[in-house]
Amino acid sequence: MSGGKLNAEQQVRNEFNQWAAEGKGEEMEAHHISITEQTLAMMSLKPGERVLDLGCGTGWTSRMMAKAVANGDQPGQVVGLDVADEMIRRARAGSVDHDNVMFVVGSALEIPWEENHFDKVLSVESFYYYADQDRALAELFRVLAPKGELYILINLYRDNHYSLRWVEELKIPVQVRTEQEYVEMLKRHTYEDVRAVRVPDLTPTPEEYSGRWFKNAEELRDFKRIGALLLIARKPDIEVPPPAYQVY
């Protein structure tokens, strides 16, 4: 990993550790619950499936998925992965009642898992923070099982002009692409059945808005109507060979 990308990842780790300390990780559930629930419905999670929650934060989505895959002859498992160790600490503390979910500190650029393992991968509101999105997609391809499904959900993308206001305000670098650019990127990595879906935020909008990101409630309502971008893709029916050597 290059020094620049490592430095960018360290910036992300530091920022989200700070978010965790300030309780912002828990706030994400309220902000993203609507678009996430709609995405989970499209994923059609089944008992026994193995799922990766990439950029899991405090683990609220991981716990939802753990319930969905729990029952069956062989209970499924959810792995939550996040670069911020404080987020992972909070995720573990909040998941003691879930036997089939585990949380790991790690990078999307070097996913600490074996090849061809996960039936499904979900990433909620984290993919645009990855300094090398191509490498992340290659890693996801590696750890997905043959015919495994990938779901990437993001609010920050160029086609939603309201979201571009965040770029200069964020303290860490982000990647900003159009829907079509993301679709083409997935296809370059030989994912199949690539498609993009807009997921509107169905939560009620207050009549008065006093936040910092929108001029008024009407802008917030329009932002929700445009919706988040959900990228869906499938790994072909092939296995990725393990590396030729291992370092112990």
Where are the regions a protein language model picked out?
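Conserved class I S-adenosyl-L-methionine
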Residues: M1-K46, W60-M64, M87-R90, G94, ...
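A short glycine-rich, Lys/Arg-flanked "PGG" loop and its adjoining helix->strand segment in the class I
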Residues: D134-P146
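Short, glycine-/aromatic-enriched active-site segment of Class I SAM-dependent methyltransferases
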Residues: N155-P173
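Class I SAM-dependent methyltransferase SAM/SAH-binding core
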Residues: L52-E110
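Short alpha-helix
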Residues: V174-T190
